[in-house]
């Protein structure tokens, strides 16, 4: 079968490899049909992704069709359309036993710690495979990135009536903003790109959008009844943005890091203390988040149009080499 391998930073190749087979009784062989390209893949290609080694097959935002199942698999059958939870957990560490499988101490993320889905077929344990019958393949492949946003909102313990600023109007950030809106929050978005802000305001139904400026704190207060937001989500993965995020939260507020940066973050403690702020990290997502996102997509709460660029499988190495990642969300299609 065909497979795309990131051999080392800035080097990607289309290769021929043997088709995977069922190895365990609970395995599922999936014919991959859609692959989302996300910041993790882009950072890995550029050599800036933590928790990473080469060579590596990227791809963890996946949709496909069940091609074969192991003898113990009961909830799936050949022909089912599915998506994949790419966070393979040990099930035995303290976080896992507490239900926090998304931050398992021994986690193996498909496409990061283990080879991913940038190929024609992938074998996955059945407990990480979710039926998406009723969703298009395009939509099934965006369940994972949207689940990241949904998890961040749940992690923040957001309640209706709160005000939220999401910094970074990329694929993860707009998911955060949309699910915050669905929870009853007043939502604001901030990004350097006017194009992204125009798209995200419509897609998320945000109350207002901003570009960073010296006046942005006053602009936020003007749009938010004189107050700064109670929760600030940073989805940029940018060190300077993540440190600046503290400035935008009101006293008693929260800052949630949804993005990840391979660097040290610092802040001025007297300001942090004076505001009695809460700083939270949000990592990956759980089965609960995936099911919530699928339900939201099925009931129409999530709009169409999240994917803004389509790429053929064979053209994927060329897309990475060109390095133009300004589109909101790119997706690889393997359908003939």
Please provide the spans of the model-predicted regions:
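Glycine-rich cofactor phosphate-binding loops and adjacent beta1-alpha1 units
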Residues: 198, 203-278
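Conserved hydrophobic helix-helix packing surfaces used for dimerization/oligomerization
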Residues: 3, 163-164, 255
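Residues in the short beta-alpha loop(s) of Rossmann-like NAD(P)-binding domains
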Residues: 193, 261, 285
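C-terminal hydrophobic helical "lid"/dimerization subdomain
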Residues: 243, 287-336
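NAD(P)H dinucleotide-binding glycine-rich loop of Rossmann-like/cofactor-binding domains
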Residues: 90-167
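Glycine-rich beta-strand-centered segment in the early N-terminal region that forms part
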Residues: 20-35, 48-94, 133-135
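Mid-domain Rossmann-like dinucleotide-binding core that forms the NAD(H)/NADP(H) cofactor-binding site
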Residues: 135-214
